[in-house]
Amino acid sequence: MGIKVCDLVMEYKKGVKVLNHVNLTIEHGIYGLLGENGAGKTTLMKILVTLLTPTSGTVEINGLTVKPENYEIIKKQIGYLPQEFGLYPNLTVREALEYVGIMSGMEKAEYQKQIDYYLEATGLSAHQKKKNRQLSGGMKRRVGLIQALLHNPSVLIVDEPTTG
C-alpha cells in the first residue's frame, strides 16, 4: 500500500512537460520531496490529491487507481495541506473545522471529538472562538493542518511543510 506513480507526464502548455515520465513508489512512512522551484513538486502533489489530471501515466493510492470514478473514495483517504490555503475569514476557528467535518460526511459527535483533540494538541483550544482573520500565519497553518487531519486520512500530503 502507499502511493505508486507510473510513467506520469504532465504538460501545462503544448510541448512543455512539468513532469516527464515520473516513476515513484512511496510506502507508508514519512517522506519529503526536494527540488528546485518549478521542478513539479506541487504539480505532483495536486495530481495525487485529484486536483489535477495528468496528461498520461497512472497513480495509485493504497492500491486504488486515481481516476474520476474513484475520486470520492480516494479523497477520504487523503489529507492535504496546500502551500497556499484559504480559511473563511469571518468564521471562527471552530466553525471552520466544523464545516470540514460536515463536508467530509463525518458524524457530528465524531468531528466534535476530533476537533477538541486537535485544538488541544496544536495549542489552539484557547483560540477556537477567534475569527480566522484574527490569527497569525502560524496559527492559520495549524488550523489548515487540523482540517487535513480531521477525517483520519491514511495519507497526509503537505506542500511546503516548513512554512508558517
What are these regions (language model features)?
Residues 36-40:
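Walker A (P-loop) phosphate-binding loop of ABC-type ATPase nucleotide-binding domains
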Residues 49:
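Helix-to-loop junction immediately C-terminal to a conserved catalytic motif
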Residues 98, 102, 109-127:
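Conserved ABC ATPase "signature" region
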Residues 156-159:
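Catalytic Walker B motif of ABC-type/P-loop ATPase nucleotide-binding domains
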